[in-house]
């Protein structure tokens, strides 16, 4: 059975619009995916008919909103096959989830002389929090280097570990190169040294199923807005035993058990002690609708379609004169490229004139840009609603730009 891409496209109202008098070809889903009617309608219905502050409310609307929120926690736990819904913390997104781990688990467990391992392909969200932590603690940040094809030099990884390695923080899929890292092998090596493992799953969960129990990672984090859900909501998974030991990193309402001016404060149990203040309940409802949506289509079918489209795109783009493609042949979601010596911003601006939306810049991966010796790249993302025709338009646009700019 073929993937129903036209039916899927009909669910996304923004795909019906034009840009500069041409049909929109949205090739920027790795930055933020568009939203289907099912997500828009679910969040709208909540605000129209079901909104109330969650927790402790005795009235019907509050009780129903709280139940809806906790049902999404259960739904998200099934989505990544967590052992328990109480292993999931609602966060604003991947960035906040990583910072939570750094400022809670990291603050308690990293000591002077310890080390944390990351890779050269990481998003800044999985670099900067660890830099800040290491600077505060007197710890060392170690880096897995790259091969020219955009895969990690895994032969160097074993030498980076020692008895002071406390954490491996690694992206599941590179947001620039599309490289899917071999997590089982990397996690097994971390286990040999007693290190914990955090996985940045922001670019993975929309492309194929994720099973955190099978991975045996300690932390897994992703954002809703890249999964066709709302902005301002994400999921941090933490193994229950670890989560129960972690102290809160933000104080306020909802995360306490008792507060006394003379006796101090006691915390709520996890995960609620990590959810200070009024949550983004509407975003949580929208995230649940997004999970429902991709689950109903089947992540295996989505993945098969996207891989077929990726193969086609790589074949066609390789024929564009003076193009440089970055990353491995086998990849997920993104194609980074440059056209001759032209700056990525110029290429992206021309493509926008043709109604084609791509991302340009350093993609929050400046160390990776430095490794390739370029200030910026163009990046085209392929999502489940993209088509062969849109790939053809991208190729034609780049060919025309090459002809115009020389």
UniProtKB/Swiss-Prot annotation:
Q: Where in the cell is it found?
A: Cytoplasm
| Pathway assigned in UniProt | Cofactor biosynthesis; iron-sulfur cluster biosynthesis
Q: Name one GO cellular component term.
A: cytoplasm
What are the alphabetically sorted keywords of the record?
Cytoplasm, Lyase, Pyridoxal phosphate, Transferase
Question: Which EC numbers does the record give?
Answer: 2.8.1.7, 4.4.1.16
Specify the superkingdom.
Answer: Bacteria
- The membrane spanning regions, by residue number, are none
Active site at which residues?
364 (cysteine persulfide intermediate)
What molecular function terms (GO) are annotated for this protein?
Answer: cysteine desulfurase activity; pyridoxal phosphate binding; selenocysteine lyase activity
Main location class: cytoplasm
Keyword RNA-binding among record annotations:
no
What cofactor does this chain's UniProt record say it requires?
A: pyridoxal 5'-phosphate
Q: Name one Pfam family in it.
A: Aminotran_5
**Could you confirm whether the keyword Nucleotidyltransferase appears in this record?**
no
Cite a single GO BP annotation: cysteine metabolic process
- N6-(pyridoxal phosphate)lysine-modified residues are 226
Summary of subunit composition and partner proteins: Homodimer. Interacts with SufE and the SufBCD complex composed of SufB, SufC and SufD. The interaction with SufE is required to mediate the direct transfer of the sulfur atom from the S-sulfanylcysteine.
Similarity remark: Belongs to the class-V pyridoxal-phosphate-dependent aminotransferase family. Csd subfamily.
Q: State the NCBIfam families in the record.
A: PRK09295.1 (NF006791), sufS (TIGR01979)
Task: Give the protein's biological function.
Answer: Cysteine desulfurases mobilize the sulfur from L-cysteine to yield L-alanine, an essential step in sulfur metabolism for biosynthesis of a variety of sulfur-containing biomolecules. Component of the suf operon, which is activated and required under specific conditions such as oxidative stress and iron limitation. Acts as a potent selenocysteine lyase in vitro, that mobilizes selenium from L-selenocysteine. Selenocysteine lyase activity is however unsure in vivo.
| Name of this chain's protein | Cysteine desulfurase
Q: Which organism is it from?
A: Salmonella gallinarum (strain 287/91 / NCTC 13346)
Record gene name: sufS
């Amino acid at each position: 059975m073929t993937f129903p891409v036209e039916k899927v496209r009909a669910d996304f109202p923004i795909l019906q619009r034009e840009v500069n008098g041409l049909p929109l070809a949205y090739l920027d889903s790795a930055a933020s995916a568009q939203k289907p009617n099912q997500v828009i309608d679910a969040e709208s219905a909540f605000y129209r008919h079901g909104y109330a502050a969650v927790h402790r409310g005795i009235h019907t609307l509050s009780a129903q909103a709280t139940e809806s929120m906790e049902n999404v926690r259960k739904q998200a736990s099934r989505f990544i096959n967590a052992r328990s819904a109480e292993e999931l913390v609602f966060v604003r997104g991947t960035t906040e989830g990583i910072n939570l781990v750094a400022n809670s688990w990291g603050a308690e467990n990293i000591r002077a002389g310890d080390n944390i391992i990351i890779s050269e392909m990481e998003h800044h969200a999985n670099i900067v929090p660890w830099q800040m932590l290491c600077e505060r603690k007197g710890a060392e940040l170690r880096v897995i280097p790259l091969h020219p094809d955009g895969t990690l030099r895994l032969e160097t990884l074993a030498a980076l570990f020692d008895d002071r390695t406390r954490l491996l923080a690694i992206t599941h899929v590179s947001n620039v190169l599309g490289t899917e890292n071999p997590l089982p092998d990397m996690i097994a090596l971390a286990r040999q040294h007693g290190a914990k493992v955090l996985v940045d799953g922001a670019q993975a969960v929309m492309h194929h199923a994720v099973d955190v129990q099978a991975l045996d990672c300690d932390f897994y984090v992703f954002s809703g807005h890249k999964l066709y859900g709302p902005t301002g909501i994400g999921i941090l998974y933490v193994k229950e035993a670890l989560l129960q030991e972690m102290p809160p990193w933000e104080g306020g309402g909802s995360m306490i058990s008792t507060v006394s001016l003379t006796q101090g404060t006691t915390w709520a149990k996890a995960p609620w002690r990590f959810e200070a203040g009024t949550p983004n309940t509407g975003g949580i409802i929208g995230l649940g609708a997004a999970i429902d949506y991709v689950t109903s289509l089947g992540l295996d079918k989505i993945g098969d379609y996207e891989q077929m489209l990726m193969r086609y795109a790589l074949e066609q783009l390789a024929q564009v004169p003076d193009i440089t493609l970055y990353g491995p042949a086998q990849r997920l979601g993104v194609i980074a490229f440059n056209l001759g010596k032209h700056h990525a911003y110029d290429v992206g601006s021309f493509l926008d004139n043709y109604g084609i939306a791509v991302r340009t810049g350093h993609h929050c991966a400046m160390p990776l840009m430095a490794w390739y010796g370029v200030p910026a790249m163009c990046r085209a993302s392929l999502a489940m609603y993209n088509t062969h025709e849109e790939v053809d338009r991208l190729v034609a646009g780049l060919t025309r730009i090459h002809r115009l700019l020389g």
